[in-house]
């Protein structure tokens, strides 16, 4: 096993879950990043996984990987930045485990996130909101429920998850406000 394999296994299987408390989904996404990175190193840099040592991973190769994601795989800047975040997390971890390569890790950590184009948020018009609120069938129980939920979302500006997390104890009709816990 290479030093890269050893540290990557520890990073994914122990460090992220036990020390950082990352979710299963985060570990899955970080694993996917490293699968792509290993694929890049093999296909483009011609370094087989069983010959991939930490000394082979340079800032230039990481930049090449990020360029490959955008140009060859047609990933968005946002996806590229997410992949970079996963790599940066690994190299932060390495700073405390493999100090001999500190200069290499810090060079990789100096890679900046790309700016993503600003996306203007679109909103429903007043007519659109009115049309949406007219959709539930108020003669049925589910229709009345849906109408109340949509009205609460609209009036409060709350996120769907915030509404889902509400319990009866949070609602104070006497005071005309909802208490969030």
What residue spans do the PLM features occupy?
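Conserved catalytic core of the tyrosine transesterase superfamily
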Residues: 1-181
């Amino acid at each position: 096993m290479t030093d890269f394999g050893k540290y990557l296994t520890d990073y994914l299987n122990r460090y992220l879950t036990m020390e950082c408390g990352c979710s299963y989904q985060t570990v899955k996404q970080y694993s996917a990043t490293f699968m792509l990175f290993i694929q890049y190193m093999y296909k483009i840099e011609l370094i087989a996984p069983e010959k991939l040592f930490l000394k082979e991973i340079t800032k230039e190769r990481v930049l090449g990987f990020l360029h490959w994601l955008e140009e060859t795989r047609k990933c968005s800047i946002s996806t590229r930045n997410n992949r970079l975040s996963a790599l940066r997390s690994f190299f932060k971890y390495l700073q405390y485990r493999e100090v001999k390569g500190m200069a290499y890790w810090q060079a990789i950590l100096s890679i900046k996130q790309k700016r993503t184009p600003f996306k203007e948020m679109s909103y429903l018009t007043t007519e659109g909101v009115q049309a949406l609120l007219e959709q539930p069938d108020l003669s049925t129980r589910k229709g009345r429920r849906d109408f109340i939920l949509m009205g609460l979302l609209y009036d409060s500006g709350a996120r769907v998850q915030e509404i889902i997390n509400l319990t009866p104890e949070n609602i104070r009709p006497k005071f005309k406000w909802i208490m969030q816990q």
